[in-house]
Amino acid sequence: MDVNSGYFRLENVSKTYNGFIALSGVSFTVNAGEFVCIVGPSGCGKTTLLRLIAGLEQPTSGIIKMDGKVVTGPGSDRGMIFQEYALFPWRTVTGNIEFGLELKGLKKSERGEIAEKYLNLVGLTQFKNSYPNELSGGMKQRVGIARALANDPTIILADEPFGALDAQTRNQMQEEFLRIWRAEHKMILFVTHSVDEAVFLADKIILMSAQNRNVREILKNELPRPRDRTDHDFTQLRNEVLKMIREEIAFN
């Protein structure tokens, strides 16, 4: 796909569970090549939103579109990266990366070529025959990233992918993820509880409101890359987002 032409859009999307309003009238757009982070207090609907976009659930009302086409279910145009890795323990690193390609019916030689490309991209070529229980948490998450990219999705959906990692590994994985994003030119929609992570990664930060189950604020992050967490402007933006989240928590 031409990286200058794609977009992903939510139009007035709502989700209700047995009378409980999880989301109410959510609208926003992710543009081609854009890195968007979603933040907000617990219970504001971040994970529900991601499940709707992934096609794992259907909205009660509203429309989700990819390049103008309505999303009605899961599809290979959306790649998922999970916090809990979700790797098959009986498959090698290569086998996990090739799983989606097998479902597509690609020949073994084609699968191997694609897997090798993404093994190299995430720096795991020497571990291609290893099993998940032989890998560190950061390495497992790299496998998850490679598996998502191997299917060549238009957008990557990431649900707290680094939340289970220690602080040092998490920072390292953020750097790695940015490098991969720059290389692949994918749209990224990244859910996180960490405001610091959102400010470090995102072109745009979407703050969800637990009060209204909607988007409270969309903040454009124009801090130059590479970003310095100790920089005054970085700290200022982080504090601005934290202040709004604290207001949401206080309301609840």
Regions found by a protein language model. Give the residues of each.
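The feature captures the beta-strand-to-loop junction immediately N-terminal to the Walker
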Residues: 39-41
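Catalytic Walker B motif of ABC-type/P-loop ATPase nucleotide-binding domains
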Residues: 156-159
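Conserved signature/switch motifs of ABC ATPase nucleotide-binding domains
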Residues: 130-133, 151
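Conserved ABC ATPase "signature" region
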Residues: 102, 109-127, 179
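Conserved ABC transporter NBD signature motif
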Residues: 62-74
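Short helical segment in ABC ATPase nucleotide-binding domains corresponding to the A-loop/adjacent helical element
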Residues: 82, 94-102, 112, 116, ...
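Helix-to-loop junction immediately C-terminal to a conserved catalytic motif
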Residues: 54
